[in-house]
C-alpha cells in the first residue's frame, strides 16, 4: 500500500499522504524540471500567522543538516520516491511562514536504514544555511497528485470508508487510519453492534486482496473476508 497526500500524504491536513496498495508495486512519475538559475540563499520568514494550507500537501519535514555542504535530511510523509529524488520545483514552508516558498530540488537519495532522504536544495550551500531550515516542511500543490497504479489508493480516500463482512453484509466498523507495514494495515474502529467486548475498540486488518477483495470508493465501503480469529487476535 502506497501513501500519498491528504495535506499530508497520510492522515492529517497539510501532508502529502500516501498511496496504499493491496499488493506490491510502484508507480513512478518522471516530471523533471531544470534547476533555477543563480539560486539565492534561503532566509526563514520571521512572521508568525497561521498558514493556510488548504491547497498544499506536505511531503516531508527537514530534520537536520547532512554534512557540511548544505545537504538536508528529510523525514518523508509521502512514499512516492520521486518527490525527493527527481529534480524540479518544490516548496518550503518555514516555521513562521504563511505561504510555502518555491525552491528547486537538485538531488536526493534514500537512506533505507533510517527511513530518511538526503536532499540538496538550490541556494543552501553550507551547514549554517541548512541548520536554518531545520523543522521546515517540504510541500507540493494539492493539484500535483501523482497518478496511481491499479489497486493503489490515496490514504485520504480510504479513511472513513465503512468495512463490511462480505459473506454476511455485517457492518464491522470504519477505517480510521492506515498503518504502514510490509502489507499495510487498515485500522478499523469497531461498530458497537459488531463486538460485545467494550475494551476492544479497534482492529487491524491487512490490506491485501485476499482479505479486502472489494474497495468501492463510490459506495464508501470495503468488503473483507478475514480468516477465522483475525478480528479478535490482532487487537
UniProtKB/Swiss-Prot annotation:
Organism: Nostoc punctiforme (strain ATCC 29133 / PCC 73102)
Entry's localization field: Cytoplasm
GO cellular component: cytoplasm; ribosome
Oligomeric form and interacting partners: Binds ribosomal protein uS19.
Stated name of the protein: Ribosome maturation factor RimM
GO biological process terms held by the UniProt record: ribosomal small subunit biogenesis; rRNA processing
Domain notes: The PRC barrel domain binds ribosomal protein uS19.
Compositional bias segments (type: Basic and acidic residues): 1-19
Stated role: An accessory protein needed during the final step in the assembly of 30S ribosomal subunit, possibly for assembly of the head region. Essential for efficient processing of 16S rRNA. May be needed both before and after RbfA during the maturation of 16S rRNA. It has affinity for free ribosomal 30S subunits but not for 70S ribosomes.
Pfam families xrefs: PRC_RimM, RimM
Amino acid at each position: 500500500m502506497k501513501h500519498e497526500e491528504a495535506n499530508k500524504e497520510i492522515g492529517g491536513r497539510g501532508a502529502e499522504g500516501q498511496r496504499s496498495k493491496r499488493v506490491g508495486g510502484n508507480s513512478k512519475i518522471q516530471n523533471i524540471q531544470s534547476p533555477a538559475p543563480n539560486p539565492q540563499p534561503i532566509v526563514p520568514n520571521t512572521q508568525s500567522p497561521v498558514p493556510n494550507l488548504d491547497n498544499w500537501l506536505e511531503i516531508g519535514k527537514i530534520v537536520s543538516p547532512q554534512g557540511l555542504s548544505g545537504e538536508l535530511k528529510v523525514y518523508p510523509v509521502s512514499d512516492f520516491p520521486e518527490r525527493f529524488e527527481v529534480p524540479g520545483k518544490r516548496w518550503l514552508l518555514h516555521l513562521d511562514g504563511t505561504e510555502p516558498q518555491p525552491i528547486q530540488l537538485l538531488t536526493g537519495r534514500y537512506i533505507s536504514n533510517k527511513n530518511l532522504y538526503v536532499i540538496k536544495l538550490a541556494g543552501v550551500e553550507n551547514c549554517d544555511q541548512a541548520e536554518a531550515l531545520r523543522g521546515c516542511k517540504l510541500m507540493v500543490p494539492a493539484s500535483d497528485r501523482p497518478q496511481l497504479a491499479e489497486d493503489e489508493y490515496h490514504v485520504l480516500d480510504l479513511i472513513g470508508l465503512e468495512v463490511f463482512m462480505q459473506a454476511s453484509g455485517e457492518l464491522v466498523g470504519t477505517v480510521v487510519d492506515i498503518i504502514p507495514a510490509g502489507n499495510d494495515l487498515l485500522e478499523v474502529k469497531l461498530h458497537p453492534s459488531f463486538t460485545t467486548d467494550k475494551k476492544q475498540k479497534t482492529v487491524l486488518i491487512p490490506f491485501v486482496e485476499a482479505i479486502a477483495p472489494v474497495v468501492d470508493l463510490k459506495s464508501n465501503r470495503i468488503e473483507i473476508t478475514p480468516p477465522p480469529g483475525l478480528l479478535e487476535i490482532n487487537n
